[in-house]
């Protein structure tokens, strides 16, 4: 159970310690003190195999977590909508219909052609625009 929660930091630190132990110019113990049958020492090939196994287990663990997360998302309350919206045009049509209904339920505003307020007579506007302006001098002829 604890191996499933194995953090990548711990795997990386094991790798660093193994590599640091094999890269020292002067070993911690002399060659005479260490026996070749010492069970605590790993050969370079064994260290690589151990690291490969750790990485493979970590990748499998993350993949299974991702699958579980996707299964949880698939069983959420949004799944009927995703089943309904298998066709993009159906989804877009439904969304536009909802927006259109919202637009028609807004309260009416007093803006536009039929809005109450000051009404101007178009004929008087045209006459006023065609009369000479006060600041312009008129012809004496």
Swiss-Prot record:
UniProt-recorded Gene Ontology molecular function terms: calcitonin receptor binding; hormone activity; identical protein binding
Q: What is its main location?
A: secreted
InterPro entries the record matches: Calcitonin, Calcitonin-like, Calcitonin/adrenomedullin, Calcitonin_CS, Calcitonin_peptide-like
Q: Please list the residues that make up the propeptide.
A: 26-82
Q: Which residues form the signal peptide?
A: 1-25
Which Pfam families has this protein been placed in? Calc_CGRP_IAPP
Entry keywords, A to Z: Amidation, Cleavage on pair of basic residues, Disulfide bond, Hormone, Phosphoprotein, Secreted, Signal
Basic and acidic residues bias locations: 118-132
> Which cysteines form disulfides?
85-91
Biological process according to GO: activation of protein kinase activity; adenylate cyclase-activating G protein-coupled receptor signaling pathway; amylin receptor 2 signaling pathway; calcitonin family receptor signaling pathway; cellular response to nerve growth factor stimulus; cellular response to tumor necrosis factor; embryo implantation; monocyte chemotaxis
A single Gene Ontology CC annotation of this entry is:
hippocampal mossy fiber to CA3 synapse
Give residues where Phosphoserine occurs. Answer: 43
Extra info from the record? The CALCA gene (HGNC:1437) encodes a small family of peptides including calcitonin (UniProtKB:P01258), its C-terminal flanking peptide katacalcin (UniProtKB:P01258) and the calcitonin gene-related peptide/CGRP1 (UniProtKB:P06881).
Belongs to which family?
Belongs to the calcitonin family.
Q: What is this protein called?
A: Calcitonin
Q: What is the lineage of its organism?
A: Eukaryota, Metazoa, Chordata, Craniata, Vertebrata
The record's gene field reads CALCA
């Amino acid at each position: 159970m604890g191996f499933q929660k194995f953090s990548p930091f711990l795997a990386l630190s094991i790798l660093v310690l193994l590599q640091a132990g094999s890269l020292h110019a002067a070993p911690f113990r002399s060659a005479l003190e260490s026996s070749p049958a010492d069970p605590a020492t790993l050969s370079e090939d064994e260290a690589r195999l151990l690291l490969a196994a750790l990485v493979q287990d970590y990748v499998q663990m993350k993949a299974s977590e991702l699958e579980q997360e996707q299964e949880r998302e698939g069983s959420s309350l949004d799944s009927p909508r995703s089943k309904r919206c298998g066709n993009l045009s159906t989804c877009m049509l439904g969304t536009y219909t909802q927006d259109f209904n919202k637009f028609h339920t807004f309260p009416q505003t007093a803006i536009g052609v039929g809005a109450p307020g000051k009404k101007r007579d178009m004929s008087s506007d045209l006459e006023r625009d065609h009369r000479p302006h006060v600041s312009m001098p008129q012809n004496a002829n």
